[in-house]
Amino acid sequence: MKKLYTSYGTYGFLHQIKINNPTHQLFQFSASDTSVIFEETDGETVLKSPTKYDVIKEIGEFSEHHFYCAIFIPSTEDHAYQLEKKLISVDDNFRNFGGFKSYRLLRPAKGTTYKIYFGFADRHAYEDFKQSDAFNDHFSKDALSHYFGSSGQHSSYFERYLYPIKE
């Protein structure tokens, strides 16, 4: 099964990892207060101490030229299976939404916080998608809240925006 590994750090530190590993497909983005790098691979990662996920559904290819929204979806052991089944079975007609580029549904190797990456041409296209029924019915906090379990046992549902780095 394909894995996705992520690490956060300073731009310079993560960029050096990327430069030193030209044979690995490493993707680096800017977030609001940090940089993030990730590697999607069937093999071993070059990242040291990354967060590891199983890729359980994928559409499209990653690109450093696209805008991404990473959605963190908390669950509990009691609700994780149902959450996963719901998200796997979602009709993926959102792929036809203007500016859509890619999608990844990720199962955590440790813990119960799932992650979704939505890739769009730019943030404006993603914000348009967020207003759609497809997003509100399947991916919004309200749509997924009954899979969170009781409060206090998990992290919060949140989004992190990842921007292309312009050099």
Curated annotation (Swiss-Prot):
Xref: PROSITE patterns: ABM
Modified positions (Phosphohistidine) in chain numbering: 66, 79, 154
SUPFAM superfamilies: Dimeric alpha+beta barrel
Post-translational modification: Each of the three conserved histidine residues contributes to TRAP phosphorylation. Phosphorylation is essential for TRAP activity.
Keyword annotations of the record: Membrane, Phosphoprotein, Virulence
Signal peptide: none
Keyword Membrane: yes
Gene Ontology cellular component annotations, sorted alphabetically: membrane
Gene3D superfamilies from the UniProt entry: 3.30.70.100
Domain ABM: 67-158
Compartments (UniProt record): Membrane
Task of the protein: Signal transduction protein, which is a major regulator of staphylococcal pathogenesis. Phosphorylated TRAP leads to the activation of agr system and consequent RNAIII synthesis resulting in the expression of several virulence factors. Up-regulates the expression of most toxins and genes known to be necessary for biofilm formation.
Membership in a protein family: Belongs to the TRAP family.
Name this polypeptide is given: Signal transduction protein TRAP
Organism name: Staphylococcus aureus (strain MSSA476)
